[in-house]
């Protein structure tokens, strides 16, 4: 070809390498040798947990409100509810009776219906609210009659939920009747009769017999059998001076006996030293120590006996204030 001159080959330079066709053809991709496993979160290193890192907001971001649930309280006592009061009484060795303070009563001088709360104490669960007790009586009876002789009905309600604290929410568990008794010159002796509200079956009664000096109460079961005698010494400061400052700062003991000879006490009902609120009101507190072999029904009657002791010796009505 004209105008084209071939490049002479250099005999000392090897010819370029010639690439042949591939020996094998690429095949299709096979399945992976191992299947992917579940996701494993990173392990804690040096006590640092990346999963507990709180979300970081901007500086000055308001924190969400934190709701703290506190147990209900009464008079500084934290308590819980129970579902079966008789089963709780079967395991309980004692209860605390707290009277609700009536500040309006101190201001007006008019006697108000009494209210009490009964707590069972457990080393594992603390204080357990068992019952709420409220007096139902006429205004004329409260203002004109002494507390140890006036007539009233007391409804003892089992408190299983916070709704049971409402007086009209549920029916009473125990109904206690205290008939009017003219105790002047020991003509009639006061008594309190307890019945189960649901079945109207008698639970028992507590009666205060005539004694010369020392106060005494007799506890009878539903069949009329005398089960316990509750006896107190008249020479106690809290009993002789019950309505003044010295009496409120003293404990009063009423021992529980089984026999007429009062040989060995098996329990006690103790009026506790007044708290700061009880010093300026007529409210009182009682500790009831049950006998070890007492049945739940007998323990219920001992609670009623503690309420009766309050009315007979430590409840100062409006008529008592006028007589002083």
Predicted regions and their residues:
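Low-complexity or membrane-interfacial segments used for flexible interactions
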Residues: 2-17, 22, 32, 37, ...
